[in-house]
């Protein structure tokens, strides 16, 4: 199996922070936490920042990943939320 650069840099288990940017709608945070809870149950405390005009929210949430596949899987699931514009 060929590893990409990010996968080579990480040693598992590790803490990994996602930054999700989406439309400023009340359900955004709940949708993000629900997806993460389904894959990795735990207590998550997302940090939320609003854009200057209030149109977007930036949500940072840290997980404890056991494999690179968990990181990738969550990235794609978070990206598929209809009100999400970007996942970093």
From Swiss-Prot:
Coiled coil: none annotated. Disulfide bonds: none annotated. One of its GO terms (cellular component) is cytosol. InterPro entries: UPF0250_YbeD-like, YbeD-like_sf. SUPFAM superfamilies: YbeD/HP0495-like (SSF117991). It comes from the Bacteria. It holds the Pfam family DUF493. Belongs to the UPF0250 family. This is UPF0250 protein bbp_432. The lineage of its organism: Bacteria, Pseudomonadati, Pseudomonadota, Gammaproteobacteria, Enterobacterales.
